[in-house]
Design a protein with these regions (language model features):
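Short, conserved, GDST-rich strand-edge loop motifs in beta-rich repeat architectures
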Residues: 18-39, 145-166
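Structural signal for beta-propeller blades
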Residues: 25-26, 41, 87-90, 152-153, ...
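Beta-propeller blade signature
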Residues: 34-47, 96, 161-174
């Protein structure tokens, strides 16, 4: 068991969770998964002891090889975890039981630029898997994901081979989408001058990080776009 990708500590400080990805080797198997050993969620009791949560068999994509990417813990001790390459999400209680899991689905993107030609010309469309990277709880019932994408998968339910939806999503922990930015996140950055033209045909601005904060009584969501070298700020 190795290759930890993300660590979070419960708000009460009683335990930590680690997303152990066991990331695929892109130099073998044409970059495709499954590539065992599979990833797991490790839960470390701060007084001693560790529990491993089996995440196999959950996702539609490579169910034998879950690749957990990012974790966060809410005030109830519930962990939300992204399985990025598997395009899946799971919620686990503090006892290590899987409370819910669901596909991250895909997004119909319209008015995007998919051509590396030195100009921003948003006239294209694409159906893309979300493949979320970072995740953060907004409250005990909702969390947000930054849908970077990290996997090339041909012919999956009509989606583009490259994952990543160029935006971010707010979810209810029951799997319901509460808010979807679609292409508007990338559009706002491009119109502000943050457009990575070399990434147009791939994953665009690549939203990779997301966090929340409260300032003067207002809750905000911050979404980092790796390739655009920018951060979007939203009123939660």
């Amino acid at each position: 068991i190795g290759q930890p990708d993300s660590v979070a500590i419960s708000p009460d400080g009683s335990f930590a969770v680690i997303a152990i990805e066991n990331e695929r080797n892109e130099d073998i198997n044409d970059e495709m998964i499954p590539q065992l050993p599979e990833g797991v969620l490790a839960m470390l009791d701060m007084t001693g002891g560790v529990q491993y949560v089996d995440l196999t068999g959950l996702a539609d994509i490579a169910p034998s090889d879950p690749e957990p990417e990012f974790v966060d813990v809410n005030d109830l001790g519930e962990t939300v975890i992204t399985l990025q390459e598997n395009n899946h999400l799971a919620v686990v209680d503090k006892g290590g039981n899987i409370l819910n899991h669901f596909s991250a689905g895909w997004v119909e993107l319209n008015n995007i630029d998919t051509k590396k030609d030195g100009v921003y010309n948003p006239v294209d469309s694409r159906t893309s898997r979300r493949e979320p990277d970072a995740v953060v709880w907004i409250d005990n019932d909702h969390f947000a994901t930054a849908n970077e994408g990290d996997y090339k998968l041909k012919g999956y339910q009509g989606t583009h081979k490259r994952g990543g939806s160029r935006g971010w999503t707010i979810w209810n922990k029951d799997g319901t989408v509460v808010y979807e930015s679609g292409a508007t996140f990338e559009t706002a950055l491009a119109e502000a001058g943050f457009w990575p033209d070399k990434r147009a045909g791939k994953k665009g601005v690549e939203p990779e990080s997301v966090t929340v904060g409260t300032f003067e009584g207002t809750r905000y969501i911050f979404v980092g776009a790796e390739r655009a070298d920018a951060v979007g700020v939203y009123d939660a």
